[in-house]
Amino acid sequence: MPVLRDRIPRRGFFLGLALLAALSGCSSTDTFEQPVPVPEIEASVEFERVWSMSVGDGHDGDFLYLAPLVTGDLIYAASADGELYAVATETGEVAWESEFEDRIFSGLGGDGQNLYLTTENADLVALSREDGSEVWRTSLPTEVLSSPQSNGSLVVAQTTDGKVLGFSATDGEKLWQYDGSVPVLSMRAAAAPLVGGDVVIASFASGKLIALTAASGQPMWQYEVGQPQGRTELERLVDVTGQPLVIETAVMVVGYQGKLALVDIRTGQEIWSRKASSLYSPMIGGGQIYLAAADGEIIALRGSDRREVWTQDRLAWRQLTQPMVYEDYLVVGDFEGYLHALDREDGSLVGQREFDDEGIRVPAQRLANGNLLVFGNSGKMAVFQVKPQD
């Protein structure tokens, strides 16, 4: 289950993981269950490793989401203890590595010139893509868990207390700030903002999706993904923690105890919606929508009418990552560090591999060459191909 945070004004405040894991499964619609054991399957596909390496101590025991940044020929990766790497996508050869003096709190964002990250002390830092050297840094009001995002001229960071801030990509000058509202209790996770040329779209723990002008941070529209219901703060959780998925002139978004919806990116008008509860963005492939529900079910929906095609419940409550489409398969990771491959046609479990005994929290990423990049909580990073067994 995801870790929760409450609004105590203290940076880096962590609540007890075991207690919160139990609490976070409780809601007005879900009953907390223990994660099912790793299912025994008859595997027909395998995860064939192309290359692997270690990125420092990974999340180093903290509840972070240090997703690597993939940019064509290079993968940029960071660990909480300050190790930075630029790695060749094809071979895993290290192009450069750097020791960062601060503790890192967010995954990497980037543009054509710089990489961007945030620190435990709530600094936004720009680094050179050439060698990882520091270009500029600026202070933030409080901690940021999601990766800063940039359109090349504007860098946007979203704090855990609901502030969205825009900075100049050139020198870090603060350009604007939007103050969103957040509930007393929320998940210890946050969606990275979407940053386009004219619009910034931010997701909030209040269940709101809000579009801001990139030039000034002024609100353009807002959409309610989830509406708090119930008497307790736990029942009223409606966090949107997955980055919205852009589909031409619309965005697809899902919330915890909320809904899955397609929204017009220009106006915020709902195109369609259906009830759903998830902490990760949906995935699209072959005309279908794939969703890892908060209770561990994986659901395939027909894109044309959102009717269920299949549901896989053999990974219940295993804290699954966002599904990733790989050819005829769907790949998810879980809290015990297993990778699972599902047949996209019927959702059956067809492959399995233990990857990182500290767990997998960051969703797998598809590389330009078609391979699969996986980053584990301990800092293990590897590229796989998913193939039928010989």
UniProtKB/Swiss-Prot annotation:
Lipid attachment points (N-palmitoyl cysteine): C26
Q: Spell out the SUPFAM superfamilies in the cross-references.
A: Quinoprotein alcohol dehydrogenase-like
Q: What is its main location?
A: membrane
Would you say which domain of life the source belongs to? Answer: Bacteria
**Lipid group attachment sites (S-diacylglycerol cysteine):** C26
**What are the record keywords, sorted?**
Cell outer membrane, Lipoprotein, Membrane, Palmitate, Signal
Q: Name one Pfam family in it.
A: PQQ_2
Q: Where is the signal peptide?
A: 1-25
Membrane-crossing residues?
none
Q: Which GO terms describe its cellular component?
A: cell outer membrane
**UniProt-annotated location(s):** Cell outer membrane
Membrane protein topology class: Lipid-anchor
| Entry's Gene Ontology BP terms | Gram-negative-bacterium-type cell outer membrane assembly; protein insertion into membrane
InterPro entries per UniProt: BamB, PQQ_b-propeller_rpt, PQQ_rpt_dom, Quinoprotein_ADH-like_sf, WD40/YVTN_repeat-like_dom_sf
Q: Which family does it belong to?
A: Belongs to the BamB family.
Q: How does it assemble?
A: Part of the Bam complex.
Q: What does this protein do?
A: Part of the outer membrane protein assembly complex, which is involved in assembly and insertion of beta-barrel proteins into the outer membrane.
Q: What is this protein called?
A: Outer membrane protein assembly factor BamB
What's the gene?
bamB
